[in-house]
Amino acid sequence: MDGMHMNSTGDNPIEIDFENYANHMNKFLMAHIICMIIAYVFILPAGIVLAMAKSKAHIPVQIVYVILTLIGYIFAHISHHKASPENYYKGNIHRPVGRFFMWITFLIAIVGITTSILKKRMLKEYQPAAEAPGAMEDPEQALQRNSLDDGAPLLPREGNSSDEYLPPQSSRRDVSSEKPSIPSISFINIRSWRTIPKKWCVLQVLRYFHRILGHLWLYVGFFESCTGIVLLAGIFKGQHIFNGLAHWIKGAIFLWYGILSFGEYLGAFSEYGWAWNVVPKQLSEKRFAKYVPTKEMVESFLLFAYGVSNVWLEHLGNTDGKWNHHDLQHASLAFMLWWAGLCGILVESKVVHRLLNATLSATLGQRRSEDSEHSENGLPSYNVFPALTVFFTGIMMSAHDQTNHVSTVIHVLWGRLLAAAAIARICTYIMLYLKPPSSPWPTRPPTEIITSFCLICGGAMFMASSYDVVNKIRLNEMSPMLIMNISVAFTCIVMGLEVMFLILKGYASSR
């Protein structure tokens, strides 16, 4: 479908937008862009990793992020009123969605500050009147430590406020020699919730709400950045929006796939066994461990959801409503992702493992104690369906016929990058199958660097292969090589920032 509607006449609306889009660029808009880049690319990720490291510095960083976001929003508002009406992008969602996200940003900040204040107040209640030397405990460790023994209800201490709770006297610990610890309701028996003070429940709910929103805000910032680029460049108008959505959604998925893969290589999510490591025994024995999906299950589900949601998207961009061979190519690709993702989900499912073992279990007269080999030994999964799906996506899109040379070359380049990423991932599986990891520390197979690099670079070039973007490349007489160079540089910047943020997390955790 790319390039099918190319218009070489001088009144091409895309060409007019491209030549005049600089009219948008006043000093207030530039200030808005700079503020948002600093806030979303540097400050927000730093605040997230500091919060994950339980550092007290994450609150000041979060305040700086909110202030920068507010200043950037004000600059954007001024810029909009100074722009001439003919430069408005009618029907854009960047401004209304940005306004909504601004309020959510304030909500996140309020929740974070409230949680911090509430935690400090409750910690004071749990400090004995006369502290013994060396009795002080790190507040965050106190919050993390669970005073519930096997879900036993908490009982108030005699002679003290009813807000101070201790384990029942039947506990084997000598509670008289300890200061009361702060209960955690993360993974305890639900029946014991009624015996926990309501303020503890409120604190834990606020903490998890703040943590979840903080992680989601990375993707929100990326979404707003993409809509801002679309607004500034004047692309994806009218029926072209469907072609733009199809390419940018797909490209963004592969781009974030690569970012997460590189994070796993560096050691992120190692507590779940996602860093090509053995799941730590202390965590695998916890009650919640059996509910944590494998990395391959998450990847398969994302491919499945992506395939289901993108079957008809390219066809909707047709002005005549008729099916052509480009529509069939895109629909068949979506069906492949749909069913390949479903195969990956089924292969990774513990329920399916039990059913597949049912015949042997009946013959032996016993059931396996665990659902799968990798869960039994704490080893990573060797489900290759996600890698195969990415490989064939790259191979097929490399052969995706286009109506102009620039679009054809760009499709070939990012298709080969995705295929290379899949091959590198399969090499990772082969190496780990021949020599499985034996330590809870991240294995860091070198092939995962290639996988991550090719996914990020391929995803960026995927987004650049949409119809309107290719037209702008041609109108400005740029070559596919330049787009490749920009994508490679962008990939190196992203991976470098990711390393620095995880270094910051490790440094904060060590302190």
From Swiss-Prot:
Protein name: Uncharacterized membrane protein C3B8.06
Family label: To yeast YCR061W.
Principal subcellular localization: endoplasmic reticulum
Membrane-topology descriptor: Multi-pass membrane protein
Record PTM Phosphoserine, positions in chain: 147, 161-162
Gene3D superfamilies per record: 1.20.120.1770
Segments for region (Disordered): 157-180
Organism: Schizosaccharomyces pombe (strain 972 / ATCC 24843)
Disulfide bonds: none
